[in-house]
Regions:
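Catalytic core segments in nucleotide and nucleic-acid processing enzymes
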Residues: 22-173
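Interdomain/boundary linker segments immediately adjacent to catalytic/signaling cores
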Residues: 1-26
């Protein structure tokens, strides 16, 4: 992963890493303690990469978490992404090696400037940022995965790359 990776390739690779990073995480849902059921997190792509359709890039089940892949250079786009989901919390996956803390600080400073002292607006945007994930976290999480998970990442990259490039998908089975 690099900052100069083509946008579609970065989205495919980041999806594959995140899908495999989260897939073994368990959560519990139920209407009472006695009805709790264990479920594993699942990440889904919501459409084609770089479709410019205004959609969210990935959605996590069963928690309903939204992920948007973007670049660090245009904070107006982040605010538009937040607006399009009505300020629902969103995780930004950013093609940068800048630390996520620095990106978050810059984004929050940009929000503060744009809010012109209006606390309600500032808080709505600040509260809509669930998490910042950069190339640094993606690399770190890849290094923590098992060999089987790395193989799964490579298979996912191959499948989604072929899909994006309108190539035939080869089935290894």
């Amino acid at each position: 992963l690099s900052e100069d990776a083509e946008a579609r390739i970065f989205e495919i690779i980041s999806y594959s890493i995140l899908k495999n990073h989260y897939k073994n995480t368990k959560v519990y849902f139920g209407y009472s303690l006695s009805s709790l059921q264990e479920e594993k997190l699942q990440l889904y792509k919501t459409g084609r990469t770089n479709a410019n359709d205004g959609g969210i890039d990935f959605v996590m089940r069963p928690v309903g978490r939204f992920f948007q892949v973007t670049e660090v250079d245009n904070y107006d786009k982040y605010l538009l992404d937040i607006d399009k989901v009505m300020h629902f919390p969103i995780t930004f996956v950013i093609r940068t090696k800048t630390s996520r803390e620095k990106v978050l600080n810059e984004l929050e400073a940009y929000i503060d400037e744009r809010a012109n002292g209006m606390v309600v607006i500032r808080e709505r945007y600040h509260n809509a940022i669930e998490e910042i994930i950069t190339i640094n976290e993606l690399n770190e999480w890849t290094n923590e995965l098992s060999n089987d998970d790395v193989d799964s990442i490579l298979r996912d990259i191959d499948i989604y790359y072929r899909l994006e490039m309108n190539m035939d998908i080869v089935d290894d089975d």
